[in-house]
Amino acid sequence: MTDSIQPQADTLPHRGAEWWVARAIAVLAALLFVQHGVVHFMGFACTFGLAGSDAVNDGYTLVAALDPDGWTMHALGVAWLLPSPLYLVASAGLVLRRNWWQAWALAATVVSLALCILWLQPAAVGIAVDITILVGLAVYVVLAHRSASCTARSSRRRTR
């Protein structure tokens, strides 16, 4: 009776080590996207004075000359929220193995990088994370293109 509860070895999906490594990297990248998107709420909180620190004017920033209570600073504060949902959508697409996740990740990262550059010193870690994401996206695109062209060549050889 207990044998029926245990899965049979031949019924389990057989996946190679490459598949598991690729899935682990995808999950880790998705977690990075989610974490970086959540951190963007700090930028929003700081610009509206909700964070308990004056990170808007701490260190070297390109927006230090702006009025902290002015409409420009508040518009930039709202802009800090934009990458959050973009990163969440990108992470969902990545985990679900959809083809569109790269575009969402790229859009989120470009907006994030622009905001982090405006707050250069307080957001230095964000710049490093954004550059890491951009490099990762570039590597992914190159590897995916090579894989697709290898697959196409191999299928052409089989049809000859």
Predicted regions and their residues:
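Membrane-interface extramembranous regions
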Residues: T2-R160
